[in-house]
Every structure is written in structure tokens, then in C-alpha cells.
Regions:
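Primarily marks hydrophobic transmembrane alpha-helices of the MFS/SLC 12-helix fold
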Residues: 54-57, 255
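Central cavity-lining transmembrane alpha-helices of secondary-active solute carriers
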Residues: 31-45, 229-241
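Symmetry-related core transmembrane helices of the 12-TM Major Facilitator Superfamily/SLC fold
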Residues: 144-161, 342-360
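C-terminal transmembrane helical hairpin of 12-TM major facilitator-type secondary transporters
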Residues: 249-296
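Extracytoplasmic gate region of multi-pass secondary transporters
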Residues: 6-11, 186-240
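Helix-loop-helix hairpin linking two adjacent transmembrane segments in secondary transporters
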Residues: 118-164
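Cytoplasmic helix-loop-helix junction between adjacent transmembrane helices
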Residues: 85-122
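C-terminal ends and interior cores of transmembrane alpha-helices
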Residues: 62-76, 261-273
Length: 377
């Protein structure tokens, strides 16, 4: 949940009485944790395959707790400090590179969609952040929120140390060069792109919608946070649902549906003037992206089961890049046109490109590795 703190606190951090940031600075600030969450997934994915998921998870959580303590005690006194904090929070976002292979390796192929979706439903922390952080900031000041965040971070670390176990599947440690070997396979490029759109869409909206709703409809930070919580809840809960549906009808067919729905919802969100209908459009978009995340990770273990740690890092890096792009496109659009429309339309066009990509690969996937997979693709 701490991964999204800068996003849900952005309205207070960027306020004239605080750091007085421009729209472009605001959206770049919130995109930094997304970008570094993707980059650090590469490192954590490599560590998972070399030293195991459990020690990697413990190490990552200790880094995050140290960063939260520094932000609380020392403070974030300028724009540059928020960017450094965003890099640290990226480690929290990279935790998916630990959780997904650690969970997935306990279960058979035909259950991967549901299992990976449930593991990825940790996105529900975004909802908790959006509901609580703006209210805590209003009551105690936004710097204090980083101190409050230490409490659940320490609690999660303690629970993880007590109950987590390494999966029974033994994985041969990979070298960093294996990333480059894998990246030479064209299917890796496709998975990275598909996840760039689904996860990038979800997390980009999770970080950006608070500022979007406040700017466009003149809401308070608390009101905007409530709407972000509503929209992101369906995305977080939709991930296991999307994975489960993909187990039944196949990930390729599912992604066709989710990309189409997300594209239309983003366009509608950019055009509709009514607050209620606007929220409904982004609720649908977040739900489609969340379910799409589950579908991508239903397919991934079928194709790259033995390299799941590495692939989780690579694909997660693509997802982080997508969120970074969406947040910055919205910021650039707002800065230079006074509207968010252009940024939303550009990302909607990526959904269309993803649909074209699916049509390009589906026959080959179904007749090659999909034909021998132990689950529907």
C-alpha cells in the first residue's frame, strides 16, 4: 500500500502553501515510484531466482521501512526530495516480483490465473491509501503520513517472516545475462507490451486520478481520494477475477474483451462532463485493466514457467513503464493544453495497438506452446 503514497498525497504535497508544483511536476513526481517499481522488479526477480523469495521479500521491506522513516523524520523539503522518495517507494512496488513467483510455484498450471490474481490483489492497498492518507494529511499534515505508514509496513514484515515459506519447486539460479537472453525472444516483447497496457493503465490511473478529479471537478483531496478508492478497488479485486475467467475461457480471448472495454472507457472519461458518469467511466477502465492484469499472468506461467522469476521482473518492468507513460502523458496534456483529453486518448490508442498485437500472435501461440500447455490460453 505504501507504493502509492505520493500519488494519493500529491494534491497536498503540490499545494501552493506546500511545494507549489506545476502540473507537469506533480505528475512526474507521482510517476517516479511507478517507473522505479518496474526497474527494481528486474533486480528483485533476479534475487528471487538466486537467493529465494523469502529473503528477497524481507530485504525489500526493510529498505521501504527505512525510506518511510527518513521521509518522516528528515522530511521532504523540496521537489527533488520527493523524487528520491519516489525511487525508494518503487521498491515497494517491485514486491510483485517476489509475491507472484512465490505464490505461483506452489500451484499447478490450470490454477495459475486465479492464484496469480489473488497474489496480485495486493493492489487493494491502493484503496486503503486513497481512503486514509488524505484524511491523515488533513489532520496531522502530509509529512506525518509517512510515519503512520511505518506501522502497517512493520506489521506486514513481521507476518511475512513468521508465515512465509519458499515454494517446493527448486529453481536453478539465473545470471543477470539471462535477462538479455530472454529479451531476445519475441514472446517476451509481446508479454511486456501487453502488461505495459494493462498494469500501466491501472497503476497510472491509481496515481493520477486524485489530481484529475480535484482539478477537473474542483473536489477536496479527501473527496478525490474517495473516488480514487472506488475506482481502484474494482481494479484490485478484478485481478483474481480476470485470472479465474482466463483459466476458463483463455487469456487471449479475455484480453480482447478487456482492452476493448478499457479503450472505450478512457475515451468516454476524457469526453464526459458529468462527475458521476466520469467516475463510472474510470471505474470501468480500472476494472478492465485489473482483470487484464490477471489474464496476462494466467498466460505467462504457461509460456515461461521455468523462468517465472525473471519474467515477472521483465514483464513488471514493462508495466511500470506503462504507468510512467500514462501519468506523464496526463501531466503533459494538462500543462500544455489545460485538459487531460490528449493524454487519455494517447493511452486509449495503446489499447488498440494491444488488440492488434493479440490478433497477430494468437494463432502462433495456440499452435505452439499453447497446444501443449496444461491450461487454456
Amino acid at each position: 500500500m505504501v507504493w502509492t503514497l505520493l500519488g494519493v498525497l500529491a494534491n497536498q504535497i503540490a499545494a501552493p502553501e506546500s511545494l507549489n508544483l506545476t502540473p507537469q511536476q506533480r505528475f512526474f513526481m507521482v510517476s517516479v515510484p511507478i517507473l522505479f517499481g518496474g526497474i527494481f522488479r528486474l533486480a528483485l526477480g533476479l534475487l528471487v531466482d538466486r537467493i529465494g523469495a523469502r529473503p528477497t521479500g524481507i530485504l525489500a521491506q526493510l529498505v521501504v521501512i527505512a525510506g518511510l522513516a527518513a521521509a518522516w523524520i528528515i522530511g521532504l523539503k523540496n521537489y527533488e526530495a520527493t523524487l528520491l522518495m519516489g525511487m525508494v517507494l518503487g521498491v515497494a512496488g517491485a514486491s510483485f516480483a517476489v509475491a507472484l513467483p512465490q505464490a505461483g510455484r506452489w500451484y499447478p498450471p490450470h490454477m495459475q490465473g486465479l492464484v496469480m490474481g489473488l497474489a496480485g490483489a495486493g493492489n487493494i492497498g491502493v484503496v486503503i491509501d486513497a481512503l486514509l492518507a488524505p484524511r491523515l494529511a488533513a489532520a496531522y499534515g502530509w509529512p506525518a503520513v509517512f510515519g503512520f505508514a511505518i506501522i502497517p509496513a512493520v506489521a506486514v514484515l513481521a507476518i511475512y517472516i513468521i508465515v512465509s515459506k519458499e515454494p517446493p519447486v527448486k529453481i536453478t539460479p539465473k545470471k543477470f545475462g539471462d535477462y538479455f537472453r530472454l529479451f531476445g525472444e519475441k514472446d517476451v516483447h509481446w508479454f511486456c507490451f501487453f502488461y505495459t497496457v494493462t498494469f500501466g493503465g491501472f497503476v497510472g490511473l491509481a496515481y493520477s486520478l486524485g489530481m484529475y478529479f480535484k482539478d477537473r471537478f474542483n473536489l477536496t483531496p479527501q473527496q478525490a481520494g474517495d473516488l480514487v478508492a472506488l475506482c481502484t478497488a474494482i481494479g484490485a479485486l478484478g485481478r483474481p477475477l480476470g485470472g479465474g475467467i482466463s483459466d476458463r475461457i483463455g487469456g487471449i480471448k479475455s484480453l480482447h474483451i478487456y482492452y476493448s472495454v478499457a479503450c472505450l472507457a478512457l475515451i468516454a472519461g476524457g469526453l464526459i462532463e458529468s462527475l458521476a458518469l466520469n467516475v463510472a467511466a474510470f471505474f470501468i477502465a480500472c476494472g478492465a485493466f485489473g482483470m487484464g492484469n490477471g489474464s496476462v499472468f494466467q498466460l505467462l506461467p504457461q509460456r515461461f514457467g521455468k523462468e517465472l522469476g525473471l519474467m515477472t521482473g521483465l514483464v513488471g518492468c514493462g508495466g511500470g513503464l506503462g504507468g510512467f507513460l500514462l501519468a506523464n502523458m496526463m501531466g503533459q496534456s494538462r500543462q500544455h493544453t489545460g485538459s487531460y483529453l490528449a493524454g487519455l486518448f494517447v493511452f486509449a490508442s495503446l489499447c488498440i495497438l494491444a488488440l492488434i498485437g493479440l490478433n497477430f500472435v494468437k494463432r502462433r501461440w495456440r499452435t505452439t506452446w499453447g497446444a501443449v500447455a496444461a491450461a487454456r490460453i
